[in-house]
Regions:
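Active-site neighborhoods and metal-handling regions in enzymes and metal-associated proteins
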Residues: 1-219
Length: 219
């Protein structure tokens, strides 16, 4: 499906994305400015030899994901639950990863539930495994902590210059019969919540993607 060079680029991009993620963790502390952390993480990705696969995103508290700071964002990190999502690519081979930091000190079990679910799912992900079985594993681990998996957020495949593609990796037993195949690249993305297990779109969009060129119209 992919060339040896592309696979090598994927491994390098994943290492850089992970290093940038951990660098971001070191910056997440009370008094830090959200926008400064986002910019620093993207700069770290470039410094390490890759390009950001998408804008670094920092989501706070009830906002589960996909919050991207605008240039005028003056949000200061305080006692929130903070999710950092960043990605890197080399030659189009895209790596996507995230972490959660609990500055409030109140949600350590919630953070652990998501992390353990991700690790457990990663252990069973292999060619021939049904995506619903991965979702069930995620749901079971999160439920063991007394939380719910968010069902309308999911993991996904990664392609060349494509951040989101098939297969969908659910966070529960969705009944999807799709099987992982040799050569697929996937991102497993568990989300644990003390709430109902569903999210709503409530924030404005700050992330845009180039679709195609269009000719300039004459007056």
């Amino acid at each position: 499906m992919f060339t040896d060079e592309q696979i090598l680029n994927w491994r390098k991009a994943a290492q850089i994305a992970a290093a940038a993620r951990e660098f971001g963790r070191s910056l997440i502390k009370p008094g830090a400015r959200l926008l400064d952390v986002s910019v620093a993480v993207e700069e770290k990705i470039r410094e390490l030899g890759a390009l950001p696969a998408f804008p670094a995103q920092i989501s706070l508290n009830h906002t589960a994901a996909h919050n991207c700071a605008d240039p005028n964002d003056a949000t200061i990190l305080e006692d929130q639950v903070i999710k950092l999502d960043c990605g890197a690519h080399i030659g189009g081979s895209v790596a996507d990863n995230a972490l959660t930091v609990d500055l409030s000190g109140k949600w350590s079990e919630l953070v652990k539930a998501s992390k353990d679910a991700c690790l457990a799912a990663g252990k069973i992900a292999a060619p021939g495994v049904c995506v619903s079985d991965i979702g069930k594993e995620i749901d079971d681990v999160i439920a063991s902590y007394g939380f719910k998996a968010i069902r309308n957020l999911c993991g996904h495949g990664l392609g060349l210059y494509i951040v989101h593609t098939g297969p969908t990796i659910p966070n529960f037993d969705s009944g999807d019969s799709e099987i992982l195949e040799e050569g697929m690249v996937i991102a497993i993305e568990p989300f644990a919540t003390p709430g109902a297990g569903l999210v709503q779109e409530i924030e404005k969009a700050n992330i845009f993607m180039f679709a195609h060129k269009r000719p300039i119209r004459s007056p």
